[in-house]
C-alpha cells in the first residue's frame, strides 16, 4: 500500500474543516493530515488534534495574488513531503476526493493501484454539488452532506490535479500542475461543496474581507448556477460520468493545453444513493 498524505489551507471555515479532517483522517490517519491556517488570528480547533497544524501570517493581496502565494506555500511543502510519502492529496477545505463505492475499494487502495508511469499527478472528475433550491432545504450540519444533496454539475473547473506523486508546482487552487498534463482516472471523483447550501454562500457574500479581496464575481457566479440548476435536465450518473471522463481526457482549451474542456456542455447528474454516507 502506498503511503499517502493530504494537505489543505483554511481560514474561517470550522464546519468544512471538521468534515475534511473526519473524512481524510478516517482514510489516511490524522497523523498524515497537514493543515495550514491562513492568519495568525485563527484558532486551531479540537477536530485537528493529531494532525500537523501551522498558523501562517495572513496571505495578503487580491484573490488572484493571494491564491498564487498560498499554492506556492503548499507546493513547496508537498515537495518536501514527497521525500516521505508516495502521494500527496491537495484540496481546498470544501473538496473531497472520493472513490466510487461500486468499486469496493478505499481511497488508499484505489490510488495504490493507479499506474503513474509518465505522470506527475492524478486527477479526479470534478463533481460540483449544488443545492436544488426548489427541492432541497438547508443543510443539517449534523448529518452526512451527501445524504441531503442529490444533484451536481460535472465541472471541468473541479477536475483538478489533486494528487501529486512527483515534486512539481501546483497552479492556483490545485487546478493544474505547471508541468504536465491531466491524468483523469475513471471511478475517482472530486466532490466540491461550495454551492451545496444557499445560506452558506450568503454568509460568504456578506463577508467584507472576501469582498475586498475580489471574491464577489466568483460568488455571484455560484449563486447564478444555483438558481439555474432546477431548470436544467438531470442526466444519469453512470452514463455521463463516463462520457465526461472521456471528453475531458481528450479536449483542451486552445489557450490552455493543460486544462480540460467539455465543449461547453452543462451536464447535471443525480448522485447515486451509494455515495450518501461518505461525507
Residue ranges and their predicted role:
Residues 3-5:
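Cell-envelope/extracellular polymer assembly enzymes that use nucleotide-activated donors
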Residues 8-19, 39:
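Active-site beta-to-alpha loop of glycosyltransferases that engages the nucleotide-sugar donor
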Residues 20-23, 73-77, 109-110:
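Short, hydrophobic/aromatic alpha-helical segments in well-folded domains
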Residues 22-31:
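Short, acidic, metal-binding catalytic loop of nucleotide-sugar glycosyltransferases
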Residues 30, 85, 116-119:
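Short, high-confidence coil segments that cap the C-terminus of an alpha-helix
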Residues 34-37:
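Short internal beta-strands
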Residues 41-91, 98-102:
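Active-site-proximal specificity loops/subdomain of glycosyltransferases
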Residues 67-72, 101-279:
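Catalytic-site signature of metal-activated, phosphate-bearing donor transferases
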Amino acid at each position: 500500500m502506498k503511503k499517502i498524505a493530504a494537505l489543505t489551507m483554511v481560514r474561517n471555515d470550522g464546519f468544512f474543516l471538521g468534515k475534511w479532517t473526519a473524512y481524510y483522517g478516517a482514510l489516511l490517519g490524522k497523523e498524515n493530515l497537514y493543515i495550514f491556517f491562513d492568519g495568525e488570528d485563527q484558532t486551531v480547533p479540537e477536530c485537528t488534534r493529531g494532525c500537523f497544524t501551522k498558523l501562517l501570517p495572513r496571505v495578503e493581496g487580491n484573490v488572484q495574488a493571494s491564491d498564487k502565494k498560498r499554492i506556492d506555500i503548499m507546493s513547496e511543502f508537498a515537495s518536501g513531503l514527497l521525500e516521505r510519502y508516495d502521494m500527496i492529496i491537495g484540496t481546498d477545505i470544501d473538496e473531497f476526493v472520493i472513490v466510487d463505492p461500486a468499486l469496493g475499494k478505499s481511497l488508499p487502495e484505489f490510488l495504490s493501484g493507479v499506474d503513474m508511469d509518465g505522470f506527475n499527478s492524478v486527477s479526479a472528475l470534478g463533481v460540483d454539488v449544488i443545492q436544488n433550491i426548489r427541492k432541497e432545504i438547508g443543510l443539517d450540519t449534523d448529518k452526512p452532506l451527501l445524504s441531503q444533496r442529490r444533484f451536481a454539475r460535472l465541472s471541468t473547473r473541479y477536475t483538478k490535479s489533486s494528487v501529486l506523486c512527483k515534486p512539481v508546482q501546483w497552479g492556483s487552487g490545485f487546478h493544474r500542475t505547471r508541468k504536465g498534463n491531466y491524468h483523469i482516472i475513471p471511478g475517482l471523483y472530486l466532490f466540491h461543496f461550495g454551492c451545496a447550501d444557499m445560506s452558506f454562500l450568503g454568509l460568504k457574500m456578506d463577508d467584507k474581507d472576501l469582498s475586498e479581496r475580489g471574491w464577489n464575481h466568483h460568488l455571484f457566479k455560484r449563486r447564478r448556477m444555483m438558481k439555474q440548476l432546477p431548470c436544467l435536465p438531470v442526466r444519469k450518473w453512470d452514463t455521463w460520468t463516463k462520457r465526461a471522463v472521456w471528453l475531458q481526457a481528450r479536449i483542451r482549451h486552445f489557450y490552455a493545453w493543460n486544462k480540460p474542456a467539455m465543449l461547453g456542455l452543462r451536464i447535471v447528474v443525480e448522485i447515486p444513493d451509494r455515495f450518501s454516507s461518505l461525507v
